[in-house]
Design a protein with these regions (language model features):
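Short flexible coil/turn linkers enriched for glycine and charged/polar residues
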Residues: 14, 85, 233-235
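Non-catalytic alpha-helical coupling and interface elements of nucleotide-dependent molecular machines
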Residues: 45-53, 125, 156, 193, ...
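Residues in well-ordered beta-strands of folded domains
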Residues: 21, 92-94, 121, 152-154, ...
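Pre-Walker A-like glycine/lysine-rich segment at the N-terminus of P-loop NTPase domains
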Residues: 1-50, 55-70, 79
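Extended helical coiled-coil dimerization/tether regions that scaffold
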Residues: 187-247
Length: 247
């Protein structure tokens, strides 16, 4: 197997750096429900292909991709007027030596030389610093400002990459998460991409995020949260309703 190790941080259930090692043959992930088996596979797939749930990850960045505890810590710091850095998703794939020599370097979280691999991040983009500072001063932030985030890929040699040019590929078969795009979806996405300026898209995303925040804080929805959680006998964690964050 080309991948020897995966390190995941702040992606879904994995807050602190979580490491999984693989052998060259068949690898089986065994664990209880909600232990993160599917999340590990999703992390590998998105880091290699840029696809999540059947769609380009750049088109569906969402706070739900982030570890909830990390997001809550960030929001608490903003509320206390001592904001910490917005959380960042990091996925690193360590390749077997000799797989992709041009991907070799120390651009990894371990700062180790002579290692081949790819580093995928969903992180706050510094180009939005002024807009973010303005948001902190003028608005009450109750959710992650995902409109200021970008998804990027880098080889361990620190060269930025496009996922379609990463030679190693993965196939993830999970029909439960696959979402098909109809003709109108494709047309609207093309219009947004081709005709709107970046500041227009940011404004739309902020308005959409505010709408979702209002939905989550609605008293009727809060009451339904409590009923759902009380009725649930399948999962240990809390169940809740949420509005779709795709724009």
């Amino acid at each position: 197997m080309a991948i020897e190790k995966v390190i995941i941080q702040n992606f879904k259930k994995f807050k602190n750096p979580f490491e999984v090692k693989f052998n060259e043959n068949i690898n089986l992930l065994v664990g209880d429900n909600e232990s993160g088996k599917s999340t590990i596979l999703e992390a590998i797939h998105v880091a290699l292909t840029g696809m999540y749930a059947g769609r380009n990850i750049r088109n569906q960045l969402s706070t739900y991709l982030f570890n909830r505890e990390a997001v809550e810590e960030y929001l608490a710091s903003v509320k206390n007027e001592q904001p910490i850095a917005p959380p960042e998703i990091m996925i690193e794939l360590y390749f077997k030596s000799g797989t992709l020599p041009e991907y070799e370097g120390n651009g990894n979280s371990e700062k180790s030389d002579g290692i081949e691999g790819i580093r995928f991040t969903i992180s706050f983009s510094d180009k939005f610093n002024s807009e973010y500072e303005s948001l902190l001063k003028t608005e009450k932030i109750t959710s992650l400002p995902i409109e200021f985030y970008e998804a990027k890929w880098f080889s361990f040699s620190r060269d930025e990459k496009m996922p379609r040019f990463i030679p190693i590929k993965s196939v993830m078969i999970d029909s439960s998460n696959y979402r098909y795009q109809n003709g109108s979806d494709v047309y609207i996405s093309r219009v947004v991409k081709d005709f709107l300026e970046p500041e227009d898209i940011t404004a739309i995303t902020q308005a959409h995020r505010n709408m979702i925040d209002e939905f989550a804080q609605n008293e009727a929805i809060q009451s339904i949260y409590e009923k759902i959680s009380a009725a649930s006998t399948v999962m240990k964690g809390k169940l809740s309703l949420s509005a779709d964050q795709e724009v």
